[in-house]
Amino acid sequence: SSQNILSVASNLIANNQNRVGKTLKTTMEEGELVKLNCFKNGKDEAIGISDEIEKKLKKKYSLNNISILVRAIFQTREFEERFLKIGLPYRILGGIKFYERAEIKDCVAYLRLIHQDKDDLAFDRIVNNPKRSIGESTIKQIHEFSKKNSLSLELASKKLIELNLIKPKTKIGLNSFLNFVAKWRNDLIVKKINHIKLLQNVLDESGYSAMLKNKKDLENENRLENIKELLSAMKEFDNLESFLEHVALATSIDQDWEGEKVNLMTMHGSKGLEFDVVFLPGWEEGLFPHQKSIEEKGQNGLEEERRLAYVGLTRAKKIAFVSFALNRFFQGNWIDSIASRFVDELPEKNLEKNTFFVNEDKNEEDFEFNQDFEEQNETRSPGWIRYQKRIK
């Protein structure tokens, strides 16, 4: 890494109590200042970072040598959406693309079946997910009956129950599933509840949320965070139909080409790797340092998070961007956020501070650069107010 990047990283990690103080030196030149960027919200952060990547491309940087490092895997969604929109190829290193993650496909399958009772692929995926004592032999029986009578799998299941052709134990689970699907469809069509509340009902009433919460491990915690991020994504659409169309489009775009790609990964997964340009988004309290880490491990947890920040910064050989947003969209609601305590630990002399805001009065995405917040007449959210106090 350049000397500026190492100076920032050294200053940060020096705040750990259980560390012998040392100053890192490099054979590389001083290099560019570390960029500290403040955005209005998470969507603007994704736009700003993608714009910066485009600028680096024009300067002949390789996409393979550009990386975005996030604290938690659910954070990739906003960047994936943006990259798909502008046609910027990307890869998830050490992970799976957002809409291809198992729990996201499960949620989408529930919504697809509620929306369209003839969606046999969706039915197949969720009929026994979570487990409802519906075995492979019963599923095979439903498929054969469906094919023979030219019925959808859902209608075939109903008919088999009517004809008393399903085993008693299996019948209870299958009947319960079909009744829930009918209830959720009624919620959507008759009660006209919105698509976000619909998915929340599905997750609670199907037992899917309980299934993930009952097995407390990192994988299931990540799955729950991904589902929360899905609920946030759904808020961007007016109704269920437009959301499902978006998912169909996002999953049909072929990104598996052999050319260069931007790297998206977690900080944990970046250990041992280096890139010319590194973006470190989401440096906000609760997200990074992660609230759970501090709650469970106290000071040790905080120091682990700080070491992770150190790892993230030192993955950059030439240029490092640290950024945070003043507002985040979380489970369908705007929440105010504030810059991570780690931001305060970065040495001023090695930083270039910028505030960015998309100009919403114009059609194109345009940035107001380094303007004072007062001039931009932004919404005075609690996050905005706290940030003002910090910079004055």
Map each language-model feature to its residues.
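Conserved helicase motor
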Residues: V70-I73, L93-A102, L230
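Well-ordered alpha-helical segments embedded in enzymatic catalytic cores
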Residues: E45-G48, E52, D106, E229, ...
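Proline- and acidic/polar-enriched loop/turn elements at helix boundaries
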Residues: K25, I68, G94-G95, K158, ...
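Conserved helicase C-terminal RecA-like lobe
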Residues: S62, T76-L88, R101, V108-K349
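Structured beta->alpha junctions
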Residues: C38, A72, I96, P130-K131, ...
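Helicase P-loop NTPase motor core
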Residues: S1-P89, R112-Q116, D187-K192
